């Protein structure tokens, strides 16, 4: 068969297909939905996990330090000198890699931006060329050296319109002119987006881990991560064993956080994102599988429809290839159109998902389609369509040629084809059950989380952050005075009832600190500096003693308030009057405070996590060393409680009030406290959004598939139904028969899907909160919805079977 003849045959098949736009549209849309879901999730996977970091030889990049969260390392500047001497390293750098607020100004305009800090070795080790300017030099990385800043490409474009002459200019950073020495390349992946890098001048004698530095290193060629990890452990254990701060509690802490080396990609990004993204991909693959099953059913029915024509052509001597070309041509066209439509839907889906997927998962960038994602879509769509066409061809070859010719084209839905159709329906229903149970369980999880008391009242409260400009508010006393004046002025703004300030809002952030109880061993606790009204703004209840008072000022007795869980866990429920101590400078100096009150517990991270023991210290009593450490973490949180019935103060009124008492002091955007609380369940909402969307698509496709199979089966059995009607069978009996057959398929699919869901219970359980996979409410709802949807899909074919005119069947005889 010549190529020209093959091409003619394919074009003829496409013209024939175009004359049936309904079938073509249904097939393309079915495939597009499956391709879109898998492509969108593959794009997330590729961006987060699969695509190598754009640094030269990224497999040689590691972080060194003590294990912190799963998959993360943390280090102190004092570790840097000994780590630099490790023989396994080619280069090394240090950074404070989590963005913190920084106040920048150009002329009269000021704003808060996100900044990290790093030494010259950091960018040198990563190895990316600058878009403009240069890296920090060694002089700028020494204590007492000149200040410098490197801009992110995005900030350079926004703030300087991409002007190359911005390099060499000065930018007001924290009230001090700082020279811009370089611009980062457009693609600079990091865990969280930032606007600028400030030059870091580490104190190489400091071993305090509270500032969360990371040490990035490039391994020498041929050195494995395991070998570097072993050398890191030996080096840091020797350093820490000889530390003057090492005691039994420190040593126990070291055993829980062993020193090691971790690949940069693993230690930069959220360790939980990989598991969640693979879960999403599995769910999306289920949708593609259902779409493939539906497409197979459609193309099989299409093949059966031309079976008589194929039998005639075969009898006239047509080759197997020529008989297969129409189905293959249709598969190619449907695959191409479905892939392209799926790509468009995936692109739209990623744009809509941008605000839901954490940037930390996506290397600090918004989700987008890559070249690999486009290739994946084309391969997935093309392969699915061709496999569906191939199955139709194989099933068509099994039909008896003589029987087909004798039937005159009335052979229709054979016993074997009918059995295959039922199997495909059962498979679709089973897959839909698994996805719907997942969506129902995530819904139940969100319901349970919403019922958990956070320990504070978020209604009528708004928050914003303010970082005192460092060059104007240098000391702790300066910061306290600025805070006092701003609070006093804000309380005069109409609509504001109370104003409180703390180092952290009640939830969505953590600040861990080591606390010593009555001179005994240290314990881990959450730590907050707060003004007197902060606890009142959020109505955190006072359980015993008193709260923070206006009289708790510098020079007076140092006091603190502890949470109920702190009192119960560490003070045996007898907290009042006890003495707790905090490290004042990361070393031997400690600040002792008397416990004067006990307040209710607060869930600092999310409703899924238990309340953590917490110490609240009056902001006015913070020590100078403590302030210098804490301001490195960023800003103070101002909480404003609005009067009942008041419309509230808008952001412009707040900014104007602050400008009166603290000129050129920028603040971050105002947000309702309820929005901050809602963000604590963002991951669970993302789970529900995606799995729920996939489950809805699966339900729709399964219902369409059941309808198609039942409709064709009824059409193929019209003669049978007509004869039975002629013999006296009432329409209700024929209806019940068709619905009963559909019910059997649905029931088998439900049981099979339920069994698969139970088999996956251990995998699903990690994503649930106070809900079991075998939750009767979730399972009952899923079974009811699927059974109803399936029977509704079968209702139209059943009614058609009951309406077959008896005379039509008799005339056919």
Protein language model features and the residues they cover:
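Interfacial "coupling" helices/loops that link adjacent transmembrane helices in transporter permeases
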Residues: 291-335, 704-746, 750, 800, ...
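Mid-to-C-terminal secondary-structure elements
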Residues: 115-138, 146-276, 351, 438, ...
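Membrane-proximal extracellular/periplasmic loop immediately following the first transmembrane helix
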Residues: 42-46, 50-101, 212-216, 260-262, ...
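Alpha-helical transmembrane segments
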Residues: 33-60, 350-359, 431-460, 763-773, ...
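Small-residue-rich transmembrane alpha-helices
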Residues: 41-44, 296, 331-401, 444, ...
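Short, strongly hydrophobic transmembrane alpha-helices
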Residues: 20-48, 290-292, 339, 421-445, ...
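Membrane-helix entry/capping segments
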Residues: 1-26, 54-56, 67-70, 109, ...
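Alpha-helical transmembrane segments of integral membrane proteins
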Residues: 1-25, 264-270, 299-325, 329, ...
């Amino acid at each position: 068969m010549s190529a020209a003849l093959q091409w003619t045959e394919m074009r003829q098949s496409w013209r024939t297909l175009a004359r049936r736009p309904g079938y073509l549209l249904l097939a393309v849309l079915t495939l597009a939905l499956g391709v879109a879901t898998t492509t969108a999730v593959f794009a997330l996977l590729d961006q987060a996990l699969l695509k190598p970091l754009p640094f030269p030889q990224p497999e040689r990049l590691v972080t060194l330090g003590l294990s912190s969260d799963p998959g993360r390392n943390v280090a102190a500047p004092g570790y840097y000198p000994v780590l630099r001497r490790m023989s396994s390293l080619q280069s090394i750098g240090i950074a404070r890699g989590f963005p913190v607020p920084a106040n920048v100004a150009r002329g009269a305009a000021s704003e808060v931006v996100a900044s990290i800090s790093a030494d010259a070795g950091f960018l040198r080790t990563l190895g990316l060329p600058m878009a403009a300017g240069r890296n920090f030099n060694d002089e700028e990385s020494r204590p007492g050296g000149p200040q410098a800043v490197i801009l992110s490409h995005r900030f350079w474009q926004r703030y300087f319109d991409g002007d190359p002459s911005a390099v060499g200019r000065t930018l007001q950073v924290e009230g001090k002119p700082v020279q811009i020495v370089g611009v980062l390349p457009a693609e600079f992946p990091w865990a969280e987006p930032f606007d600028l890098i400030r030059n870091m001048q580490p104190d190489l004698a400091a071993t305090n881990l509270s500032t969360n530095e990371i040490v990035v290193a490039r391994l020498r060629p041929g050195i494995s991560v395991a070998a570097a990890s072993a050398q890191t452990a030996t080096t840091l254990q020797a350093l820490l064993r000889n530390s003057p701060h090492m005691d039994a509690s420190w040593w126990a802490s070291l055993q829980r956080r062993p020193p090691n080396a971790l690949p940069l990609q693993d230690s930069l990004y959220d360790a939980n994102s990989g598991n969640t993204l693979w879960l999403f991909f599995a769910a999306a693959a289920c949708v593609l599988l259902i779409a493939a099953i539906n497409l197979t059913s459609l193309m099989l029915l299409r093949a059966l429809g031309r079976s008589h024509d194929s039998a005639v052509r075969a009898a006239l001597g047509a080759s197997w290839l020529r008989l297969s070309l129409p189905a293959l041509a249709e598969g190619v066209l449907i695959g191409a159109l479905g892939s392209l439509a799926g790509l468009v839907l995936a692109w739209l889906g990623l744009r809509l998902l941008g605000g839901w997927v954490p940037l930390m998962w996506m290397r600090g960038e918004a989700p987008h389609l890559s070249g690999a994602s486009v290739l994946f879509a084309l391969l997935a769509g093309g392969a699915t369509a061709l496999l569906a066409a191939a199955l139709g061809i194989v099933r068509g070859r099994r039909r008896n040629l003589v029987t087909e010719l004798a039937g005159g084209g009335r052979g229709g839905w054979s016993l074997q084809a009918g059995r295959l159709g039922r199997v495909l329906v059962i498979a679709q229903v089973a897959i839909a059950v698994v996805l719907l149970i997942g969506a129902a369980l995530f819904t139940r999880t969100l319901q349970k989380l919403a019922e958990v008391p956070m320990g504070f009242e978020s209604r009528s409260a708004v928050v914003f952050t303010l970082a005192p400009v460092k060059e104007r508010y240098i000391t702790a006393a300066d910061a306290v005075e600025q805070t006092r004046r701003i609070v006093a002025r804000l309380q005069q703004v109409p609509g504001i009832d109370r104003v409180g300030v703390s180092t952290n809002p009640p939830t969505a952030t953590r600040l861990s600190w080591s606390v010593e109880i009555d001179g005994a061993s240290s314990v881990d606790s959450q730590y907050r500096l707060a003004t007197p009204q902060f606890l009142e703004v959020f109505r955190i209840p006072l359980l015993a003693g008193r709260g923070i008072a206006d009289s708790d000022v510098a020079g007076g007795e140092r006091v603190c308030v502890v949470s109920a869980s702190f009192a119960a866990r560490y003070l045996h429920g007898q907290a009042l009057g006890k003495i707790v101590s905090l490290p004042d400078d990361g070393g031997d100096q400690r600040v002792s405070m008397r416990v004067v009150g006990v307040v209710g517990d607060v869930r600092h991270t999310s409703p899924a996590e238990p309340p953590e023991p917490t110490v609240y210290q009056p902001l006015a009593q913070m020590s100078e060393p403590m302030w210098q450490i804490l301001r490195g973490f960023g800003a103070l949180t101002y909480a404003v409680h609005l009067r009942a019935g008041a419309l509230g103060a808008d952001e412009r009124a707040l900014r104007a009030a602050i400008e009166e008492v603290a000129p050129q002091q920028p603040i971050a955007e105002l947000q309702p406290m309820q929005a901050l609380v809602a963000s604590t369940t963002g991951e669970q909402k993302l789970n529900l959004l995606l799995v729920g969307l996939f489950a809805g698509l699966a339900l729709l496709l399964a219902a369409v598939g059941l309808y198609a199979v039942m409709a064709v089966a009824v059409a193929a059995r019209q003669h049978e139904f007509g004869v039975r009607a002629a013999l006296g069978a009432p329409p209700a009996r024929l209806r019940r028969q068709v619905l009963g057959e559909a019910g059997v398929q649905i029931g088998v699919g439900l049981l099979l899907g339920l069994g698969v869901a139970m088999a996956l219970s251990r995998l699903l359980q990690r994503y649930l909160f106070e809900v079991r996979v075998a939750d009767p409410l979730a399972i009952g709802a899923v079974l009811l919805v699927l059974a109803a949807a399936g029977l509704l899909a079968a209702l139209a074919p059943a009614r058609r079977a009951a309406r077959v005119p008896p005379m039509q069947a008799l005339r056919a005889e």
